[in-house]
Amino acid sequence: MPVTAPQTLGELMATVPSITDHLFRNAPKAAMTVYSQMMPGEGVRPEFTTWRDEQTAWRTTIAVHDQSYHMMSLHVRGPDALAFTQSLSVNTFKNFGVGAAKQLVCCSPEGFLIGDAILYRLAEEDFLVVGNPATTDWVDYNAQALSFDVTTESDPMWTLNKAKAREFYRFQVEGPKAWALLEELNGGPLPEIKFFRSAEIGLGPHRARGMRHSMGGMPGLEIYGPWVDYKAVRSLLQKAGAKHGLRMVGSIAYFTTVIESGWWAVPVSAVYTGAGTQGFRDWCSAQHAAMRMSLGGSYYSPDIADYYLTPYDVNYGHIIKFDHDFIGRAALEAIHDQPHRKKVTLVWNADDVLSVMSAMFEDSVVKPLPITLPLAATARMHYDRVMDKDGNTIGLATYPGYTANERAMMSLASLDPGFTEPGTEVVLLWGEDGGGARSGGNLEPHRQVKIRATVAPSPISQAAQSYRTAIGIKRGSLQEV
C-alpha cells in the first residue's frame, strides 16, 4: 500500500519524531532563492541595477518596492468584521475609521507570536489583511472557528495564485525625493496623510490610494490600486522618476529593508504546540505556511517552543492594550511586569566576517559556512544563537545581512536584559548545529565559528530613527495611532 502524505499539520506532527528537525530539512536553504521565488522574474527581477545601488536609493533618491506579488491578502467581511479582527490583535482598534490601517499583531492563547500584518479598513464591513501568510492563515482559521458573523476571501500570493492576477497592485515609493515625484504625478500638493492613514491621490490619469508607511525608514507612501492599472502605473513611475534617480528595487535588496528598519518579519509561528492551537493544527493543510516553512541557523532546540517569541521580546510591549479581549490576553497580562528580552541590532565584527569569507579560498577540509551577501540566511526562518563571553545563550538573532547604507554585516536580535545597551559586546554563533547535517543534504558540510558583534539600536539607521521620531513612532516598532 502506498504511504499517504500527511494532509494536515496535526497529522504531520504525529508522524515525524521532531517538527524542529522536519523544518530544518525543508528546502530551499538559501534566503535569496526563497525570496526570488516569492517575487517572479516577470514583475520583479532579482536586481534591476545592483542590489547595492538599489539599497542606496532609499536613502539618497527614490526607491520603488514592488509589493504586488509576495504577500498574502485576505478580505474579512461582515457585520462582525471589526469585532472579529480586534479579538485577534493585541493592540487597540479605537479610532479605526474607513481608509485607515492598523498593525494586526496576533498571539497564541499562550501569549506567543503567531505573526503580524497590516489590516486595512476598506469599508465599514470590509477589512483586508496583507502580509505574512502565517498571519493570514491564522485569521482565516479563526474566522471559521469562532462565532463571529464574518466571511473571508483570499487573494493568494503569486506563487499560489492560479489566476495569475491580483486584486490590487502595491508599490512602496520612498526616499528623500519621493514626495516631489508623487506631487508631480498628483498634479499638485498631496493631501495631508497621517501615519497609517490613506487618501486618494492621482498618478497621472490613474487614481490610487496612498498610505503613509515606509519599508526602509524614509518618507514615502504605499500606493495601491486596481490590478488592471499595474503595468501602466509601474511604467509611469519609472519614466517620471528617472530624472530623480529612481530605482526599482529587486527581490534581493527588498528583503534587506527589515535589517535597517528593525522589523522581525517572520517569527516562528507559535502554532506547533499548545492545547489552544490544536484546532489550527487539525485545520492547517499543506498549502498553508506552517507546513511549508523552512528553519535554519546556529540555534537548535528539539523543542520548537524554544523558538517562540512574545510581543514583548520584539519591542511590541507598548502597543499591547488590555482594554479589549483578545486571544492571548491572559497570558500576556500574567507576564506584563516581568523582565523581557529586547529587540536590538547586532553589528558583526568586520574582521571576523572577512575571516569567514577568506576561508573560501583556503584548502581546509571543512570550512565555515560562507556568508552570502547581502542576505546570509539559510532558511525562511533563520535563528542564530547569541552568547555572552562565557558561552551562555543570551538570545536569538535573525535576518543576517549586509546593507551598503550601513556598510556593515548585521542581524536583528532579541536579547536578555543586561545585554541590550548599545556598545555591549556579544558573540554570534555562525553555521548550523551539526554542520549542515540537519538540513537533509540541502546545505554543504561546514563548521561553526564565533563572530563577535556589537549591540546597536533597532532600527539601526539614523534615517529610520529620525523618521520615526518625526512622525511619533517609538524606536523599534509602531506606536499606537
Regions found by a protein language model. Name each.
Residues 1-41, 46, 123-481:
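Conserved, structured C-terminal
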Residues 1-103, 112, 343:
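Acidic, proline/glycine-enriched N-terminal capping motif
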Residues 53-60, 106-116, 202-211, 394-396:
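Short amphipathic beta-strand starts and helix->beta connectors
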Residues 63, 72, 104, 117-118, ...:
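Residue-level detector of beta-strand structural context in well-folded domains
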Residues 66, 109-111, 376-379:
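A short catalytic or substrate-binding loop motif that flags glycine-/basic-rich loops and adjacent residues
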Residues 79-81, 91-92, 106-114, 125-127, ...:
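A short acidic, glycine/proline-enriched capping/turn motif at secondary-structure boundaries
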Residues 85-87, 115-118, 130-131, 139-142:
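Short, conserved acidic/polar surface loops in the N-terminal third of protein domains
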Residues 95-97, 106-112, 117-123, 141-142, ...:
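Short, charge-rich binding segments
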